[in-house]
Amino acid sequence: MTEVLKTNVLQSNENIVQYYTQKIQDAELAILQKTQNLRRLEAQRNGLNARVRLLREEIQLLQEPGSYVGEVIKTMGKNKVLVKVHPEGKYVVDISPDIDIKEIKPNIRVALRNDSYQLIKILPNKVDPLVSLMMVEKIPDSTYEMVGGLEKQIKEIKEVIELPVKHPELFESLGIPQPKGILLYGPPGTGKTLLARAVAHHTDCKFIRVSGSELVQKYIGEGSRMVRELFVMAREHAPSIIFMDEIDSIGSSRSDSSGGSGDSEVQRTMLELLNQLDGFEATKNIKVIMATNRIDILDPALLRPGRIDRKIEFPPPSAEARAEILRIHSRSMNLTRGIDLKSIAEKMNGASGAELKGVCTEAGMFALRERRVHVTQEDFELAVAKVLNKGDSGEMSLQKLFK
């Protein structure tokens, strides 16, 4: 009987221990959950407090009085600046103690207090996104070795563009001004753009490419504004090269006959270009390269020395130059032995560099068509016939179409 009682007491004690152990575990789990909820709520509170602070700062900024935007003309002493505010006029204003006067340069945009006209902030230059897209971020990978048959032109463009950027002290010692720009003219496909990209590569300059037709805008003053912002962007990213292709679209000769608002807007754009060419200094490492295949219609004011310092002609390549261009473009091709590139070049009398490159591409396509991994002499001959007779085949196809 006594043993039975002892057994019952032990069982009841074990049950009590298990009961309270379970209660303790449940309480610890509840405490853990409450702690996690508290931390989550604290994180939410911190986020909301940060949001409230940002909104208060934004409200404070909105409640502050606005500022005038002006353009610095020149500094006047240690703490005075002459600023132009449109449309009010010019003012001599004080500089805030927080701004270093060494950072203030002509033609930069600044913010002025609306009550005291004190200069309080230097603003970034305003550049149109369309103008920003004209700048090629990556330096062109073209080199002089990729240009064939233009040794004379390469030498002349080196003297005018590359030498002033790399060795400006030579011009200072001689006492002559640095050239500002050059004009490349010749038939299409003769290597004008390729040589401009090669110069930008060897001078390690920012390359800004713009077509003249992009500067012809619909509304009055838009083309002139884009020209101004183009040169502003070039100054900010100096040393830089501005390559203006198809310059004849805005630089044609002016005539007295009224051709409508479109022609007058093109003339305004050209006048702004002339103004910018006269306004910037060649020592600022900004060079202008223009290209055209219609030099006969360009305005004489654009071609005068001081704006365009050298005019370089790009004639159709000679037989030796054509052979060299073929060797350059076929350098990476898998050719069979015995291919006579010189004889192929002699057959392409009057062809441009672009057509010679097209012959190499077409020869590879003929080999690809026959599922070969090498290019033969016959492929080149077929490619020459196809490229040079492209116009004839087009006329024949049109005649067949209308029969």
Curated annotation (Swiss-Prot):
GO terms for molecular function: ATP binding; ATP hydrolysis activity; proteasome-activating activity. It comes from the Eukaryota. Transmembrane segments: none annotated. One of its GO terms (cellular component) is nucleus. ATP binds at G186, P187, P188, G189, T190, G191, K192, T193. GO terms for biological process: proteasome-mediated ubiquitin-dependent protein catabolic process. InterPro entries: 26S_Proteasome_ATPase, AAA+_ATPase, AAA_lid_3, ATPase_AAA_core, ATPase_AAA_CS, NA-bd_OB-fold, P-loop_NTPase, Prot_ATP_ID_OB_2nd. Coiled coil: none annotated. It is found in: Cytoplasm; Nucleus. Keywords: ATP-binding, Cytoplasm, Nucleotide-binding, Nucleus, Proteasome. Belongs to the AAA ATPase family. The 26S proteasome is involved in the ATP-dependent degradation of ubiquitinated proteins. The regulatory (or ATPase) complex confers ATP dependency and substrate specificity to the 26S complex. This is 26S proteasome regulatory subunit 8 homolog.
